[in-house]
Design a protein with these regions (language model features):
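Alpha-helix exit/C-cap motif
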Residues: 53-78
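Amphipathic alpha-helical segments typified by the pilin-like N-terminal helix
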Residues: 1-49
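Basic, alpha-helical nucleic-acid-binding regions used in initiation and control of genome expression
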Residues: 85
Length: 163
């Protein structure tokens, strides 16, 4: 009698392996989605904190006697210290100097923009049109930063008093 040589996998074994791979893929997609969502939120919070430190440091330079502040990538000053208490001057300069900050949520808003820092009125609500966006606004006495961390969450707000 001749012996049968069975090499390979049966159809049932292959179906079980495919089912296991499908389950692992489904779990992985959900976990990855949560990971990227948390990373975006963390980046938006980091942008807010960095903008705050940057503006506070630049305004402090003015208080210590410098004449110019908030230089852009080319080294051009975006703010003359004598104008720092003029409404919107700090906000305009900060938005221009920090134009390399990118929105972790990509292009949002109308018109769509991938920038993260804007000279604009304070955010009051956080929705899909302003996720990841940090608005800078200043009066003659106060600089206000507002950031939408994630749609549906509270707006992160902080005000600085001019020195």
């Amino acid at each position: 009698m001749k012996k049968k040589n069975n090499k390979g996998f049966t159809l049932i074994e292959l179906l079980v392996v495919v089912a296991i791979i499908g389950i692992l893929a489904a779990v992985g997609v959900v976990a990855y989605s949560g990971y990227t969502d948390n990373a975006r939120k963390g980046a938006a919070k980091s942008n807010h904190a960095t903008v705050l430190k940057y503006i506070a440091g630049e305004v402090q330079k003015c208080s210590l006697g410098d004449t110019d502040a908030m230089k852009n990538k080319a080294g051009t000053a975006q703010l003359t210290c004598s104008e720092r208490k003029t409404a919107d001057k700090v906000a305009i300069a900060a938005a221009a100097a920090l134009d390399s900050f990118k929105n972790p949520y990509g292009s949002v808003g109308t018109p769509a923009s991938s920038l993260a820092v804007f000279k604009d009125t304070a955010l009051t609500t956080c929705d899909a049109t302003n996720e990841g966006r940090t608005n800078v606004q200043n009066t003659t006495t106060t600089i206000t930063l507002t950031t939408c961390i994630k749609s549906g969450e509270a707006v992160l707000t902080l005000s600085l008093i001019h020195i």
